[in-house]
Design a protein with these regions (language model features):
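Membrane-proximal intracellular helices of multi-pass ion channels
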Residues: 1-491
Length: 491
């Protein structure tokens, strides 16, 4: 294990974090708020630790898949801890568990909160909550790789460990160029949404924070009623962009290079569109009886369907009061998630397609045992290694869900609350049902349960494997001499 190089990369993450923390400081200063001091102190702490870790570049640059997973897991934990500092130092979230929960929820783009009154927070803290969504949406290491080629030719190990979906590929030959293209598209879409929200009469602050939260498919609102207090125009703009950010970013790259044929052939995109369309129509019909018209029902249904399937978590209504069929569909969408290569959480559409095709092939093999079965996705053959990884993902996901559920149920809360709380955090959705519904929060859970949720949020955002590897004892078995050498080099 190359501890020296892992520490070096984490140091650069903290250096960038120190710079990120200065942005909400400017917001606090603009509104003449005391929270600006908290961001300055937090920035200095992050920069100090970061510079300590990066003052000496390690000579050993051997970096493999194991180091990639460990670096990503530790990097996100370090990012979350430093991101919690402004909440604690400002005194606006004085409890350590709550501050860390809010920070992890922000970076993992979950949007679950322990706060009952977000409108009481300062503008700087509100901006920081939304900004953590934007930082975490595309991935902090993706951003760092845009600026610094830290791992030289081994950047793919970092990208693979952090990127959402069963596999990650290059849009262009160089991994760093791929990262820059992805972030360019990400930033451009964020700006376009913000401009459209301004046209709808939103204030500049509201438009910026909402755009940041939508882009990361996070869902931290700046109003206690989430998006319910805004006009239908604004709600529709947000709904459309939630859908847009749930699409694989490769599709937008194909648009830029003018390859419409490949876009139209995308099986994942067509499945995503189909699920959103069917779910919207079914829910609209199911709730239309209690609303003024079918058009209002369609608007509300489309907003909530896109919000949940993309794991953004914004809400315009309290869907806790919707019929059971509608709630059942929303819970199902929590697990599905958006497309691979998007900022969405959840299992991902591509994994579901691969698992479904593999299941059909296995059933078919009983009837035709000698037939060669091939799985194809987006016109390409899916390798056996990818199929195995998808199968392993589902098994690991189920075990993690069951284990988390067991620990949460120790508190004796309602089954509906506990089940959807795990689903909402592990899939990075945010709101669940009952006690963790769209108008509720996670503040009432014990520190143990909050730790379970925090682990689930990180595991869900990082596609399970990095967090599992981090806590696997066999990974850390190494020759004592090598470990001492690497740690000495890191310091």
């Amino acid at each position: 294990m190359n501890f020296g190089f892992i520490t070096y990369i984490i140091g650069w993450i903290l250096n960038f974090q120190g710079l990120f923390l200065l942005v909400p400081c400017i917001v606090s200063m603009a509104y003449n708020e005391k929270s600006g001091f908290a961001f300055v102190i937090s920035s200095l702490i992050s920069l100090t630790v970061g510079m300590l870790f990066t003052r000496k570049k390690p000579t050993n640059k051997s970096f493999y898949a194991k180091e990639g997973f460990i670096t990503v897991a530790l990097g996100w934990i370090a990012l979350s801890v430093s991101g919690a500092l402004p909440f604690l130092i400002s005194g606006e979230i004085p409890n350590v568990f709550n501050a860390l929960f809010e920070s992890i929820s922000g970076y993992t783009t979950t949007g679950a909160t322990i706060l009952s009154d977000v409108e009481s927070l300062s503008k700087g803290i509100l901006f920081w909550r939304s900004f953590t969504h934007w930082i975490g949406g595309m991935g902090v290491l993706v951003f760092v790789l845009c600026i610094l080629p830290l791992a030289d030719g081994n950047n793919m190990h970092l990208m693979r460990a952090e990127s959402p979906g069963p596999s990650v590929g290059k849009l262009v030959p160089k991994m760093r160029s791929t990262a820059m293209i992805l972030y360019g598209i990400y930033a451009a879409l964020t700006v376009v949404e913000g401009i459209l929200l301004l046209f709808g009469g939103m204030s500049l602050f509201d438009a910026v924070t909402t755009s940041l939260a939508t882009a990361g498919t996070g869902g931290f609102g700046i109003k206690n009623n989430s998006m319910a207090d805004y006009s239908m125009y604004i709600q529709n703009v947000v709904a459309v962009f939630m859908f847009i950010f749930g699409v694989n970013f490769n599709i937008y790259f194909l648009m830029l290079v003018r390859k419409p044929k490949e876009i139209l052939q995308s099986e994942e995109l067509k499945t995503y569109l189909g699920i959103v369309l069917v779910a919207t129509v079914v829910i609209a019909l199911n709730i239309s009886g209690s609303l003024s018209s079918i058009w209002v029902a369609l608007q509300q249904a489309f907003f909530q369907v896109t919000s949940i399937i993309t794991t953004t978590g914004f809400s315009t209504v309290d869907f806790n009061h919707w019929p059971e069929l509608s709630k059942f569909i929303l819970v199902g969408l929590m697990f599905m998630g958006g497309c691979a290569g998007s900022t969405s959480g959840g299992i991902k559409i591509s994994r579901i397609i691969i698992a479904w095709k593999n299941l059909k092939n296995e059933i078919s093999s009983f009837v035709h045992p000698k037939r060669v079965q091939v799985i194809r996705l987006e016109g390409r053959k899916v390798g056996n290694d990818v199929v195995k990884s998808v199968n392993a993902y589902f098994v690991l996901y189920a075990l993690l869900f069951i284990g988390s559920m067991f620990l949460i149920c120790i508190e004796n809360g309602s089954f509906e609350t506990n089940f959807t709380a795990i689903a909402a955090t592990l899939n990075n959705v945010g709101p669940g049902l009952a006690g963790v519904g769209p108008m509720e929060n996670f503040g009432g859970f014990s520190p143990l349960s909050k730790c379970v949720f925090m682990f689930g949020m990180l595991a869900g955002r990082l596609e399970l494997i990095p967090m599992i590897i981090l806590f696997s004892p066999w990974v850390w078995k190494n020759k004592r001499s090598n470990k001492k050498k690497s740690l000495k080099e890191a310091i």
